[in-house]
């Protein structure tokens, strides 16, 4: 048994989720469901990022408080994740008392570190808005590549920036020119940790290529010290004398949500929390040590915050927190060949699609066709085809034709039969290979292998022709259907991490547990009433979706329905 932490990135609570968010976060749920089925102790956490200027600006636009805005989207996020089957052990929010209390404790210790110091720096100020601006709300020209960039990061080249380094900076809220005012802040000396971080990054060849490449490039360019505090109204108070009117910079507290939420998830067992984070490792005898693994799942725009910023904070704090083991960083998802744009409402909003379509349909499409290794495109036509062709036509068809045949011709009872050793051996092999692929973050390969086995199962049914042998060779017919039931049992468990809704239904029909091993359905078991697993989607309706985006849109509208 292993101790597993799985952290999904925390979405900003200033607007609705779109399918690009889900494409990046969904692998975390596959990992959580698999590791639980494999018998590991899992702590799967995430939450809503409620602080920072994006939320404050949305609140100002709507005439509400930041707390009201973040609470609304937090509730919406939690409901969307529930409808998509995300099995969080704890889904929190950065505005919760639990998170704020933990962050203050962490930062108090952090400020005692030799890596933290004070410095007077220029901070972006917009005269028109009458407020200081977070770096992400300053736009201008990137000094590295010449592209349009925000004050915190250039999406074009991936460089982590400071607002004052931009050329021709303007306020992203109102478009006015900005000035920079001197302000005293706490800084973390990333430059002094550069060699330690470099050695750590280079020791993780298991990371996805984008995580390795981006992280190595950031370090090679030279890590710049970053401010831990900012002149903001909405955020967590700085636990340091003289900083009563400032807030902890959002990047220095939101990544600590993995720590605060796992502590909340394990509040009844504080020793388990300490063990999960390696804080009591020295107290354990070598032969008693539990294997621990931490996964962080997010989009590639969040890579530096998980491979540089979070490790730097954990190191500087000095308490011995475990650093990330696995970085599962997805590429970008486009929509019908174009970049998703929330400002133009060119997106598929999760709150709409989950109310109309089966959660497993979206899960399957994004896992089988998502941006795992390279940018991927969401196409309504292909979404329909993948549902009708793979889920309904291959997997659902095999289950339905097999179980309905038993109900119709064999009295609804699983028959006695001789196990097919080749199929049994392949099922066992799949449990091993699919588990290994999931642990290495190769979800598409794992799903492809399972569906190749689905196609083999359908071929087995066709080649055995039970619709003929039920009249000509009842023993052969019984053998066929017995083995088909065992195949269904194997497929339901293998697909459980990917397609939990349909797998739970099949496991219920056959009285199976999601335990990660080949399971047997005994002869004589009487089947309950079997219903269709997936409904066919109308091939014509994707054209209606395309028509929506040919018309002007201004706000979050119902573009998914």
Annotate each predicted stretch with a short phrase.
Residues 1-200:
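N-terminal, positively charged nucleic-acid-binding surface of large information/translation enzymes
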Residues 301-303, 366, 373, 382, ...:
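Active-site-proximal binding-pocket segments
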Residues 139, 194, 347, 380, ...:
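Residue-level signal for cytosolic alpha-helical hairpin/rod architecture
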Residues 78-81, 107, 111, 396, ...:
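Structural signal for well-ordered, non-membrane alpha-helices
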Residues 30, 68-79, 105, 394-401, ...:
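A non-catalytic, amphipathic alpha-helix used as a structural packing/dimerization or gating element
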Residues 1-3, 43, 47, 119-129, ...:
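Basic, alpha-helical terminal appendages of large translation-related enzymes
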Residues 209, 393, 441-448, 497, ...:
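Short, solvent-exposed positions on alpha-helices
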Residues 2-46, 98-102, 167-408, 448-450, ...:
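Structured secondary-structure scaffolds
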């Amino acid at each position: 048994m292993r101790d597993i932490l799985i952290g999904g990135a925390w979405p900003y609570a200033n607007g609705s989720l779109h399918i690009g968010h889900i494409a990046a976060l969904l692998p975390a749920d596959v990992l959580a469901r698999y590791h639980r089925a494999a018998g590991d102790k899992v702590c799967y956490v995430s939450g809503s990022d409620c602080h920072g200027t994006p939320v404050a600006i949305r609140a100002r636009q709507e005439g509400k408080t930041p707390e009201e805005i973040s609470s609304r989207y937090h509730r919406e996020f939690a409901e969307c994740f529930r409808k998509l089957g995300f099995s969080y052990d704890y889904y929190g929010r950065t505005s919760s008392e639990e998170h704020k209390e933990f962050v203050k404790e962490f930062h108090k210790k952090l400020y005692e570190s030799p890596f933290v110091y004070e410095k007077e720096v220029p901070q972006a100020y917009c005269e028109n808005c009458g407020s200081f601006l977070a770096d992400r709300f300053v736009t201008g020209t990137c000094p590295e590549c010449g592209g349009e960039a925000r004050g915190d990061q250039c999406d074009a080249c991936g460089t982590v920036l400071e607002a004052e380094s931009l050329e021709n900076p303007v306020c992203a809220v109102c478009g006015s020119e900005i000035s920079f005012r001197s302000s005293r802040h706490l800084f973390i000396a990333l430059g002094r940790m550069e060699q330690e971080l470099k050695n750590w990054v280079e020791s993780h060849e298991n990371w996805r290529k984008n995580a390795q490449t981006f992280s190595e490039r950031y370090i090679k360019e030279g890590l710049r010290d970053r401010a831990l505090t900012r002149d903001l109204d909405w955020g967590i108070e700085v636990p340091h004398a003289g900083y009563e009117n400032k807030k902890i910079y959002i990047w220095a507290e939101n990544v600590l949500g993995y720590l605060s939420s796992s502590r909340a998830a394990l509040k009844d067992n504080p020793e388990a929390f300490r063990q999960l984070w390696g804080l009591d490792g020295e107290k354990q005898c070598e032969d008693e040590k539990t294997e621990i693994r931490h996964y962080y799942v997010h989009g590639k725009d969040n890579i530096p915050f998980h491979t540089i910023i979070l490790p730097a904070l954990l190191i500087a704090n000095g308490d011995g927190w475990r650093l990330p083991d696995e970085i599962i960083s997805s590429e970008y998802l486009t929509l019908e060949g174009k970049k998703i744009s929330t400002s133009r409402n060119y997106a598929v909003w999760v709150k709409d699609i989950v109310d109309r379509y089966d959660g497993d349909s979206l899960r399957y499409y994004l896992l089988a066709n998502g941006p795992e290794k390279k940018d991927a495109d969401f196409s309504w036509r292909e979404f329909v085809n993948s549902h009708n062709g793979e889920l309904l036509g291959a997997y659902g068809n095999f289950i339905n034709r097999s179980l309905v045949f038993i109900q119709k011709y064999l009295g609804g009872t699983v028959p006695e039969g001789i196990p097919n050793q080749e199929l049994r051996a392949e099922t066992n092999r799949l449990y091993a290979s699919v588990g290994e692929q999931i642990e290495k973050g190769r979800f598409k390969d794992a799903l492809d292998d399972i569906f190749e086995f689905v196609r083999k199962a359908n071929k087995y049914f066709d080649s055995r022709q039970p619709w003929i042998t039920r009249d000509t060779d009842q023993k052969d017919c019984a053998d066929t259907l017995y083995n088909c039931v065992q195949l269904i049992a194997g497929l339901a468990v293998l697909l459980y991490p990917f397609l939990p809704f349909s797998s739970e239904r099949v496991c219920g029909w056959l009285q199976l547990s999601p335990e990660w091993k080949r399971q047997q359905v005994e002869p004589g078991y009487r089947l309950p009433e079997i219903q269709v697993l997936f409904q066919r989607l109308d091939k014509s309706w994707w054209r209606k979706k395309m028509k929506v985006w040919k018309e002007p849109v201004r706000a979050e509208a119902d573009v998914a329905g």
